[in-house]
Protein backbone atom coordinates (compact mmCIF):
# COMPACT_ATOMS: atom_id res chain seq x y z
CA UNK A 1 0.00 0.00 0.00
CA UNK A 2 1.38 3.43 -0.95
CA UNK A 3 0.81 6.41 1.34
CA UNK A 4 1.13 10.12 0.62
CA UNK A 5 3.83 12.07 2.43
CA UNK A 6 2.30 13.81 5.46
CA UNK A 7 1.49 17.51 5.01
CA UNK A 8 1.54 19.94 7.92
CA UNK A 9 -1.73 21.56 8.93
CA UNK A 10 -2.36 24.81 10.81
CA UNK A 11 -5.32 24.71 13.20
CA UNK A 12 -7.08 27.33 15.29
CA UNK A 13 -6.87 26.09 18.88
CA UNK A 14 -9.03 28.30 21.10
CA UNK A 15 -7.68 31.47 19.50
CA UNK A 16 -4.09 30.29 18.94
CA UNK A 17 -2.62 29.06 15.66
CA UNK A 18 -1.00 25.65 16.12
CA UNK A 19 0.88 23.57 13.54
CA UNK A 20 0.33 19.80 13.53
CA UNK A 21 2.50 17.44 11.44
CA UNK A 22 -0.29 16.11 9.24
CA UNK A 23 -3.96 16.47 8.39
CA UNK A 24 -5.89 14.60 11.08
CA UNK A 25 -9.22 14.92 12.88
CA UNK A 26 -8.63 17.29 15.82
CA UNK A 27 -10.36 16.50 19.11
CA UNK A 28 -12.08 19.60 20.55
CA UNK A 29 -11.32 18.88 24.22
CA UNK A 30 -8.88 21.33 25.83
CA UNK A 31 -7.28 18.60 27.94
CA UNK A 32 -7.33 14.82 27.54
CA UNK A 33 -5.75 12.22 29.83
CA UNK A 34 -4.11 9.38 27.94
CA UNK A 35 -2.23 6.30 29.16
CA UNK A 36 0.82 4.54 27.77
CA UNK A 37 -0.47 1.42 26.02
CA UNK A 38 2.26 -0.77 27.53
CA UNK A 39 2.75 0.37 31.13
CA UNK A 40 -0.34 2.48 31.94
CA UNK A 41 1.61 5.65 32.86
CA UNK A 42 -0.65 8.66 32.21
CA UNK A 43 -0.25 12.24 31.09
CA UNK A 44 -2.60 15.05 30.08
CA UNK A 45 -2.38 16.85 26.74
CA UNK A 46 -4.49 19.17 24.59
CA UNK A 47 -6.91 17.45 22.24
CA UNK A 48 -4.87 18.31 19.16
CA UNK A 49 -1.82 16.51 20.61
CA UNK A 50 -3.94 13.44 21.38
CA UNK A 51 -5.17 13.51 17.77
CA UNK A 52 -1.54 13.45 16.60
CA UNK A 53 -0.79 10.60 19.05
CA UNK A 54 -3.76 8.56 17.78
CA UNK A 55 -2.69 9.14 14.17
CA UNK A 56 0.83 7.91 15.00
CA UNK A 57 -0.56 4.72 16.55
CA UNK A 58 -2.87 4.12 13.57
CA UNK A 59 -0.07 4.78 11.08
CA UNK A 60 2.11 2.30 12.96
CA UNK A 61 -0.57 -0.35 12.50
CA UNK A 62 -0.67 0.27 8.73
CA UNK A 63 3.14 0.56 8.47
CA UNK A 64 2.92 4.16 7.20
CA UNK A 65 6.39 5.01 8.48
CA UNK A 66 6.54 8.54 7.00
CA UNK A 67 3.52 9.52 9.08
CA UNK A 68 4.90 7.77 12.17
CA UNK A 69 8.24 9.59 11.80
CA UNK A 70 6.58 12.98 11.21
CA UNK A 71 4.43 12.50 14.31
CA UNK A 72 7.30 11.32 16.53
CA UNK A 73 9.50 14.23 15.46
CA UNK A 74 6.67 16.69 16.16
CA UNK A 75 6.03 15.17 19.60
CA UNK A 76 9.70 15.31 20.59
CA UNK A 77 9.78 19.00 19.64
CA UNK A 78 6.43 20.18 21.09
CA UNK A 79 5.60 17.69 23.87
CA UNK A 80 8.93 16.22 24.99
CA UNK A 81 7.74 15.00 28.42
CA UNK A 82 4.61 13.39 26.96
CA UNK A 83 6.71 11.83 24.20
CA UNK A 84 8.88 10.17 26.85
CA UNK A 85 5.79 8.86 28.69
CA UNK A 86 3.77 7.67 25.69
CA UNK A 87 6.01 7.05 22.71
CA UNK A 88 9.65 6.48 23.66
CA UNK A 89 9.85 2.70 23.52
CA UNK A 90 13.42 2.66 24.79
CA UNK A 91 12.09 3.52 28.26
CA UNK A 92 9.38 0.88 28.37
CA UNK A 93 10.21 -2.19 30.43
CA UNK A 94 7.85 -4.97 29.40
Please give the residue ranges for each predicted region.
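Acidic, low-complexity, intrinsically disordered interaction modules
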Residues: 37-76
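Short coil/turn segments at secondary-structure boundaries
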Residues: 86-88
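Conserved small/polar residues in nucleotide/adenosyl-binding loops
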Residues: 92-94
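N-terminal acidic leader/helix
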Residues: 4-50
Amino acid sequence: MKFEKPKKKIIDWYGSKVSVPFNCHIYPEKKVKIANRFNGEECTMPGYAVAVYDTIIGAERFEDWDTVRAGLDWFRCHFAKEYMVLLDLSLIHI
